[in-house]
Design a protein with these regions (language model features):
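Alpha-helix N-cap/helix-initiation motif
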Residues: 2, 26-29, 253
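Gly/Pro-rich turn-and-neighbor structural signature
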Residues: 11-69, 74-79
């Protein structure tokens, strides 16, 4: 198993440890851990074994034969690699966190430079904004971002407190006061959706599928920032790859395969593939085939486990209404579920994993398809195939509502999702309306647009540890109806 740092349990032990440190001339707890690890490494070497430890074991007194496994990310890993140590990456490959598979697939094993993104010329115009994003557990995520308008359009970067600068992607402005962009972070795919008004900033950060409110203000100058730690070409040989991690707080044997598969296939391909193998659309096509093959020919249990959980939740009823309802849903991404359990004093190994959220895969294939069909229809209003596909799914959901509601009345474990069923019903009706509008290139006036957006904002809230992910393709359709 991987070594990790712990703390002493009592004052008695602390006094004994402090005396030992004075005797050995050890300045601090890090030096004490290095002393222990040096002795342990010698024992392991005697038996031809390799020491592997998390970032905390790194110490210049340890031999270069140790292997650092990084949870702290590319910066920490890049630093130890530059010092001549070998390392593997786990940040971005945490399968206990529900995340989009494309996020894992984009994960950078080799730390990337900025390639001039933060170089501001006299002909550029730049604006910088601070932000603070409170979390459900722990301190707020803080930092700043800078957007630069140049001859080639918009570019930008983000500076999270305590982390290196990262370039941002897909910058879009909606008028002069609304903006969004994307950046992959330790929290997952991070998409700020912001409104700026004079010198104030509001809105939310979308972490995967889950919204976290954010506030901030305009800065007078561009912050200095910390450049990313990028190893030289000859040092990159010390980056051996990565390892997926699956912590057990939200995992039990009956749902283990739901957590693992098929995302672990994409992580494996990321780790054994060249850096330029990064076509997410192609990956998803092959992932679907792997999902089917691994179920039928290998015997992996992700679909069987889901059906078993649905059977238990249905309490003697048909599981079909749950299967259809689940198409619109995903478990809340990032560590949202763990943090909600912490707030409710349920963050322990005795917490029963019996919610609908526990039976859901990290990502809804149906929602991803809805997003794809919406994009096609927006780019070509005469694409009747995409319009029909959208209407088919929304109609299927509408026709399922009565049966899904009946299940929530007959199962105490489903009682908490009664509001979810009602909202999916409204969203299905809205989906058909928006599809028809986009297909005929219709528009909504400002009042109607605001009303629909408010409905989507309400439906996007986390409920019983899950999210109605169908909100996001509907938002895409809604934006296509706005008169700019």
């Amino acid at each position: 198993s991987t070594l990790m740092r712990s703390s002493a349990a009592s004052d008695v032990y602390k006094r004994q440890i402090q005396a030992f440190m004075r005797e050995k001339g050890l300045a601090d707890s890090h030096a004490l851990q290095a002393y222990f690890n040096r002795r342990l490494e010698a024992i392991l070497e005697k038996y031809h074994r390799q020491m592997v430890g998390w970032d905390e074991i790194y110490h210049p007194d340890l031999p270069k034969s140790i292997l650092i496994q990084s949870w702290q990310g590319q910066d920490a890993l890049g630093e130890v690699v530059k010092q001549g140590y070998r390392g593997i990456l786990s940040t971005g490959f945490y399968l206990d966190q529900p995340q989009y598979t494309a996020y894992h697939y984009r994960n950078e094993i080799v730390p990337q430079g900025l390639n001039g993104v933060d170089t501001i010329s006299d002909n550029d115009s730049a604006q910088s904004w601070s932000f603070s994003m409170p979390r459900l557990k722990g301190s707020a995520v803080e930092g700043s971002f800078t957007l630069i308008k140049g001859e080639g359009g918009w570019r930008g970067f983000i500076d999270f407190k305590g982390k290196s600068r990262r370039a941002v992607q897909d910058i879009e402005w909606g008028g002069d006061d609304r903006l969004t962009f994307r950046v992959d972070t330790w929290m997952g795919e991070t998409r700020p959706v912001l409104t700026v008004n004079d010198d104030k900033l509001g809105g939310y950060f979308l972490l995967g599928n889950t919204r976290y409110p954010v506030s901030g203000q305009r800065l007078e100058a561009v912050p200095q920032g910390t450049p990313p730690v990028v190893p030289e070409a000859d040092q990159q040989k010390n980056l051996l790859g990565g390892e997926a991690a699956l912590w057990a707080e939200n995992v039990a044997a009956p749902v283990l395969d739901i957590k693992l598969w098929p995302r672990a296939f994409a992580v494996a391909e990321r780790l054994w593939s060249a850096q330029d193998v990064n076509d997410s659309d192609n990956m998803y096509q092959r992932l679907q085939a792997m999902d089917s093959w691994s179920t039928v020919s290998v015997g992996l249990q992700q679909h069987t486990q889901q059906l078993v959980q649905f059977t238990r939740l249905a309490n003697g009823g048909s599981t079909l209404p749950l299967q259809i309802l689940a198409q619109a849903l995903e478990p809340a991404h990032y560590y949202t579920r763990q943090h909600l359990k912490f707030q409710a004093n349920h963050y322990h190994l005795f917490e029963p994993l019996n919610r609908l959220a526990d039976a859901l895969p990290a990502e809804s294939t149906t929602v991803r398809n809805l997003d794809r069909w919406a994009s096609r229809l927006i780019s070509d209003a005469e694409d009747s195939e995409s319009a029909d596909a959208l209407r088919h799914i929304f109609t299927l959901w509408q026709n399922n509502i009565a049966d899904a509601q009946a299940l929530t009345e007959n199962s105490y474990q489903l009682a908490a999702i009664k509001p979810v069923v009602a909202q999916v019903d409204k969203l299905a009706t809205l989906g058909i309306r928006l599809t028809d509008l986009v297909a005929r290139q219709g528009t909504l006036d400002d009042k109607e647009y605001a009303s629909v957006q408010a409905q989507l904002d309400e439906a996007a809230k986390t409920q019983d540890e899950l999210v109605i992910a169908a909100v996001y393709p509907l938002e895409k359709l809604l934006r296509a109806t706005k008169v700019e």
